Amino acid sequence: YMIDWLTNYGNNCWMSIFYNNHDNPRMVNKITEDKQYHEAIMKLLAVMQMTLKGTPFIFQGDEMGLTNYQFTSMDQVTDVEAKGYFKEYCESMSKKDAFKKILVGTREHTRVLLPWNEKLPSYHEGLVQEIRTEITDVYKTLIKLRHEDETFVYGEFDVLNKKKDRFVYKRSLEGKEYIMDCNLGKDVQKAYQADGFECIFTTGTDKDTLSAYEARVWKKK
């Protein structure tokens, strides 16, 4: 959707770039419930959000690496819509199964208060402060990069590789060029190679391959 708009309408449209809002569960959980990938996905989403054309909106908790809230009972859910669906689901399944189904899509996940208690399961086990800091640092770095170079704001947008599990695009303005290489899947992939470019930011470590959900930013020398 976003690629089609940016490609077909160019400077005639201005997108709002966001993943989360008060009416949906956290995007990272929509992509996968496998916690081992959550940190990488959060960083990947941040890279795309801060380098695509449009105005980025950071929803509360994105910058801290929050995931869906760990509700343990339907009594904790105040969302009227969720309660209505729960009652409907209970007519054809057990309350336990109905509750599981509600948790997948309820907007309650992004309406709870920010969990200041570091022991809450919204954070990764045993790495609360480290994980939160890493995600925050990624946002700080990318926001600084965006503020320092208007290429990320007003630059042209060109898709270099658009596959189901790979997204490579370029931003260019007045001779300046940046290439973003994004692995949208779990499989390790060969890194994008561009002559005359240097990698100025990466969410991974290996030089020749992209790890699961890794993203890199290349700058023209």
Predicted segments, located by residue:
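Loop/helix patches that line or flank the sugar-binding groove of alpha-linked glycan CAZymes
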Residues: M2, G10, E33-Y178, L184-Q189
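Glycine-rich, flexible loop/turn motifs
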Residues: M15, D23, T110, V153, ...
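Beta-strand-rich binding/interaction modules
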Residues: D187-T203
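Short, basic/hydrophobic alpha-helical segments
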Residues: W5
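Charged, E/D/K/R/S-rich low-complexity terminal regions of large eukaryotic assembly subunits
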Residues: L184-G185, A194-D195, Y213-R216
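Residues immediately flanking
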Residues: N21, L184, K220
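Active-site clefts of carbohydrate-active enzymes
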Residues: N12-K35
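C-terminal beta-strand-rich structural cap/linker in extracellular carbohydrate-active enzymes
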Residues: D206-K221
